[in-house]
UniProtKB/Swiss-Prot annotation:
Oligomeric and partner information: Interacts with ctc. Interacts with the immature 50S ribosome subunit. 2 molecules of rbgA bind to one 50S subunit.
GO MF annotation list: GTP binding; GTPase activity; RNA binding
Main location: cytoplasm
Family named by the database record: Belongs to the TRAFAC class YlqF/YawG GTPase family. MTG1 subfamily.
Short name of any one Pfam family annotated for the protein: MMR_HSR1
One biological process term in Gene Ontology: translation
Gene Ontology cellular component terms for the protein in this record: cytoplasm
Name of encoding gene: rbgA
InterPro entries: G_CP_dom (IPR030378), GTP-bd (IPR006073), GTP-bd_ortho_bundle_sf (IPR023179), GTP-bd_ribosome_bgen (IPR019991), GTPase_MTG1 (IPR016478), P-loop_NTPase (IPR027417)
Protein name: Ribosome biogenesis GTPase A
Function: Essential protein that is required for a late step of 50S ribosomal subunit assembly. Has GTPase activity that is stimulated by interaction with the immature 50S ribosome subunit. Binds to the 23S rRNA. Required for the association of ribosomal proteins rplP and rpmA with the large subunit.
Organism: Priestia megaterium (strain DSM 319 / IMG 1521)
PROSITE patterns the UniProt entry points to: G_CP (PS51721)
Location relative to the cell: Cytoplasm
Length: 288
């Protein structure tokens, strides 16, 4: 399923999440560790209001560990629980349950004080934009394949409760929430990491953004991957250097810029060049 976000779809997604909030104790806000700010829903704070929340930075294996720690420090300063996880490999799964119990300790203490000897399982809902790994996280927590997974945005379609041991019940929310497109750069970050379909933006433009970012922040990885002694300042020359070295050519030996763009983005997404984080906590648009 491909989600094209229009006002009607946004209103429906918000309504679905809001309705289910009445049923749950805690929200797991799933973001991409490479773009923790850009992969947040723009209205998430409004939508979940006063519900306890844990921010889960997924795909941490693809992110710059130094910047991931900066993001964790940032969330701590904001008074927000945050965990760095890798749902694909199962990293951080136990901490999700233990952190949830810690956050909800007072609530369950009150239940015991009222005579509830054995409080029920924690009820949680995962929210996030498409393709941040929601289904993968559900499958990992449940220790079996329940939710359909894939690399295409918006692959989850049905709504279901998932029991995770005796301590946690997960609500899988269909349609998830829409990404924000507040400015061009956010769109490029979403496209670079594969959070939105490649047909939404021009892939050459996305690759230009990605290469300029890597040139500025991760030049050594870029030089090593493409055997460059120096990185050309001119972006066309950089495309030419990469395309010619990797055989992205048209007839007559001319570099095929479309193929070069596809190559660069594919190698970023599959970690062939290295691990990167495109959002910096110092540039966070607003406190959580």
């Amino acid at each position: 399923m491909t989600i094209q976000w229009f006002p009607g779809h946004m209103a429906k997604a918000r309504r679905q999440v809001t309705e289910k909030l009445k049923l749950i104790d805690i929200v797991y806000e799933l973001v991409d560790a490479r773009i923790p700010q850009s992969s947040r829903n723009p209205m998430i704070d409004e939508i979940i209001v006063n519900k306890p929340r844990i921010v889960l930075l997924n795909k941490v294996d693809k992110a710059d560990p130094r910047v991931t720690q900066q993001w964790l420090d940032y969330y701590k300063e904001q008074g927000i629980y945050a965990l760095a996880i890798d749902a694909q490999a199962g990293k951080g799964m136990k901490q999700i349950v233990s952190s949830s119990k810690e956050l909800l300790q007072e609530k369950f203490d009150r239940m015991r004080a009222k005579g509830v000897k054995k409080p029920r399982a924690i009820r949680a809902m995962i929210v996030g934009i498409p393709n941040v790994g929601k289904s993968t996280l559900i499958n990992r927590l449940a220790s079996k394949k329940i939710a359909k997974t894939g690399d295409r945005p918006g692959v989850t379609q049905a709504q279901q409760w998932i029991k995770v041991g005796n301590e946690l019940e997960l609500l899988d929310t269909p349609g998830i929430l829409w990404p924000k497109f507040e400015d061009e750069t956010v769109g490029y970050k979403l496209a670079t990491t594969g959070a939105i379909k490649d047909t939404i933006l021009n892939m050459q433009d996305v690759a230009v953004y990605a290469l300029r970012f890597l040139t500025s922040h991760y030049p050594e990885q870029l030089k090593q991957r493409y055997n460059l002694n120096e990185i050309p300042e001119d972006i066309v020359e950089l495309f030419d250097a990469i395309g010619s070295r990797r055989g992205c050519l048209m007839g007559g030996g001319m570099v095929d810029y479309d193929k070069t763009a596809e190559l660069v983005l594919r190698e970023i997404r599959t970690d062939k060049i290295g691990t990167f984080t495109f959002d910096d906590p110092s540039e966070a648009e607003q406190p959580l």
